[in-house]
Amino acid sequence: MSNYDWGYPNTVWFGNGRIKDLAKACKFLDIKKPLFVTDKDLAKTKMVEETLEINKRAKLPTIIFSDLKGNPLGSYVKKGVDVFKNGNHDGVIAFGGGSSLDVGKSIVLQAALNRPLWDCTDGGSFWIENDYVESMAKNRITNPDNVKPFIAVPTTAGTGSETSRAAAIINDETKVKKIVFHPRMLPTLTILDPELTVGMPAFLTATTGMDAFAHNLEAYCAPGYHPMADGIALEGMSLIKKWLAVAVNEGANLEARGHMITSSSMGATAFQKGLGAIHSLSHPVNSLFNVHHGLSNGIFMPYVLTFNRSAIEKKIAKLSEYLSLKEASFNSFVDWVLELKEQIKIPHTISESVKITDQDIEKMSPMALNDPCTPGNPKKPNLDDMVSMYEHSVQGKLF
């Protein structure tokens, strides 16, 4: 695939081997002493070693912060901010999956805020609620120059954190996964290099791909008028339909990898319109059981789809037509989702990934109901509905 530079929703440099332009990106943003944020496992790889060598050759002193892992905690951000400030760093490079990118952008934001990071969370869906202006006014950064440049380099194709203004961080004390949101969390520059995703195992390719699918799907189904988001989500799902299974089965296929990393960025661009109950159900499972976010999204997808049927049937029929499925119908789409999940080995029930008891459901259901993604669900759920969706996902029974 050829190299392309895009200007929406942020500056994006796309193409095979574009990681070689990392030092150029730092120079472009006037970063002279970057903090390199990645997870513990990735920090030990040759891929990170080779990436750091790019900056070394350009005489850019780059320090690694890797005290983090999947489903990131607020304490990771706090440690990162201390390292960032004590090292007098003037920018952040976040390299890795969604967890690394979310921690990286949170470090940049928290370092510039004179208030806790949690003040920029929840309060209703920032995408569709009327308190957006009030929330942002409360958390306005007095001196925008304090927000240092942030370069996002994804090595997975799922979260789309590289093109979003949000981060998912778990509060250490409450064990609740919170959505941190601020306009200044949008990465200053993103490098989309398909070659960096080639090393993903098949199952991780599948689960991150389902995360991208969930972002595009829930953005498309979210209530409200946002034809730009709808258009991006439609094409994102079209790419996923054509290329996800290929990427899973042919890991070295750079064309498939390129389209999947693009669809991931598209999903995060589109979900400024909203997300829904797929994510609401996932977040408690992620924070309490450390289940991979993309995996839980893939598991919950058909249950939420069929729960929402009365609110989205016509829209899903149009989506089925756009995707050239056998029939332009809701049932045809659900059947295809189930077939795709089976093809890429995504479990049908949550019980196949983690043992969930009735007591767990009782604990998680209020968390899901109060999740900031819930207001974006096309069919307004109550507590009993959340309980029911969890129970259906345990039993493998669609609505």
Task: Indicate where each model-derived feature is located.
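ATP/NTP phosphate-donor binding region
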Residues: 1-91, 351
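Predominant activation on well-ordered alpha-helical scaffold segments within soluble catalytic domains
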Residues: 23, 52, 63, 78-81, ...
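Glycine/threonine-rich beta-strand-loop-alpha-helix active-site module
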Residues: 75-194
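Glycine-rich phosphate/pyrophosphate-binding beta-alpha loops
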Residues: 158, 266-297, 371-375
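Carboxylate- and glycine-rich phosphate/diphosphate-binding segment that chelates Mg2+/Mn2+
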Residues: 163-273, 384
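Gly/Pro-rich interdomain helix-loop hinge
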Residues: 288-363, 399
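Short, amphipathic C-terminal "tail helix"
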Residues: 360-399
